[in-house]
Amino acid sequence: DVIPHRENVLLEDIEIFKDFLVVSERENGLNQIHIKRWDGSDSYYLPFDSETYTAYTTTNIDFDTTVLRYGYQSLTTPSSVIDFDMVTKTKTIKKEQEVLGGKFKKENYTSERLWATATDGTQIPISLIRRIDTEKSPETPLLLYSYGSYGNTIDPYFSTVRMSLLD
């Protein structure tokens, strides 16, 4: 099988290159980008810097290239366009969303992925962001928004509005 069936994985998109097959997947509510050499010599998932993120392939029109262009953002990282060399496994950030005001510093925030158990035993992913100087306690204020049913989820994305609320 080129792409074997996995019960807990949703295939969202594919990109076909001369030497590579790139499969966009969703597992446990999170995007993944799986890169496979056609000759079977290498198969790996793109590594990402955060537990909570959104990643997706963008337009890749050159069949002969070894460079994959994709989009990435997380709760703490502005939207970025990245070129990834599938041979050397190196990435180059081509563009990152500018955050106006000059006060945003990524290192002031942290994010994590938690799991809640529903009454039927289903595991529900939770993406959490906070300032690093905010204490985690039951008394800490929390803004919760959610949606996840019928195969649809809210991807963890960067929001300047949310950052101002955290500040």
Residue spans for each PLM region:
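Surface loop/turn motifs at the tips and blade-to-blade linkers of beta-strand repeat domains
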Residues: 2-7, 47-51
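Beta-strand C-termini and the immediately following turn/loop, strongest in propeller blades
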Residues: 22-29, 36-37, 69-75
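C-terminal, active-site-flanking charged/polar segments
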Residues: 1-3, 39-42, 162-167
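Structural motif
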Residues: 1, 29-36, 76-84
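Short loop/turn segments that connect beta-strands within beta-propeller blades
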Residues: 37-41, 86-87
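Serine-hydrolase catalytic core recognition
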Residues: 47-48, 52-167
